């Protein structure tokens, strides 16, 4: 401990945060794979109609998100998509549509992304999350989570969310080392032999063409 700071505690907290982030990214990657091929691709250059300003073209992305949500409703017969995960780039697109029809149906204000976090609500029903580590052209993942614990696309069940061994000495080098362990189960009900096999019906991907995107 120097200057009133417990270095050991700071390092362990940082490592724990990194492991938590890795788990988040693993789950998001699995959901994106489960969703499969994108059902639509947002391309600003092909938006129809005459836009009065760039935000009108950006608002077209909300239409595609709504379409994906309604497709999920027709697949599952449970409900429309009520959450989505976007990249910081797509979050910027949503932010720039503040004076379009999209903004008038959005509750609250968007926050700057700091991790995979809740940033706003679309159409008073869809919770929007941002994945800070996603690339500009990363798909938008739209999904449905019902009121019950079993009404979802996949299930993350941590037995031990995160456990630390504390600082111990390596018997070979006598260097201080620390170990972390996590135990969890992750399942997607895709096997029709043992379940309905409809996990993929709960999620959908929307592609994003970021190469010709304009913000002014």
Per-region residue spans from a language model:
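Alpha-helical scaffold segments that mediate packing/assembly in large oligomeric complexes
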Residues: 1-2, 6-67
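Extended, solvent-exposed, turn-rich assembly/linker loops in the middle of proteins
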Residues: 40-110
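An acidic- and aromatic-residue-enriched active-site/binding cleft used to recognize and process polar
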Residues: 20, 87-89, 183
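Secondary-structure transition/capping motifs at alpha-helix termini
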Residues: 21-26, 72-79, 216
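Sequence/fold signature of self-assembling virion shell proteins
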Residues: 1-3, 7, 13, 96-216
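Long, well-ordered alpha/beta core segments of mature domains
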Residues: 25, 74, 88, 126-128, ...
């Amino acid at each position: 401990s120097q200057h009133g700071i417990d270095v050991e505690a700071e390092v362990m907290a940082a490592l724990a945060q990194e492991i938590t982030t890795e788990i988040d990214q693993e789950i998001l990657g699995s959901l994106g794979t489960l969703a499969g091929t994108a059902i639509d691709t947002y391309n600003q250059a092909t938006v129809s109609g005459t836009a009065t300003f760039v935000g009108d073209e950006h608002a077209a992305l909300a239409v595609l998100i709504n379409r994906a949500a309604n497709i999920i409703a027709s697949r599952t017969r449970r409900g429309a998509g009520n959450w989505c995960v976007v990249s910081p780039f797509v979050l910027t697109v949503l932010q720039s549509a503040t004076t379009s029809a999209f903004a008038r149906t959005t509750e609250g204000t968007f926050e700057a992304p700091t991790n995979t976090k809740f940033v706003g609500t679309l159409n008073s029903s869809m919770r929007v999350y941002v994945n800070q580590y996603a690339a500009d052209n990363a798909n938008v993942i739209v999904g449905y989570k019902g009121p019950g614990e079993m009404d979802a696309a996949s299930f993350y069940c941590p037995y031990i969310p995160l456990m630390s061994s504390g600082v111990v000495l390596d018997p070979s080098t006598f260097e201080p080392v620390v170990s972390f362990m996590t135990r969890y189960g992750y399942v997607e009900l895709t096997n029709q032999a043992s379940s309905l096999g409809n996990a993929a019906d709960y999620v959908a991907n929307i592609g994003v063409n970021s190469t010709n995107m304009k913000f002014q």
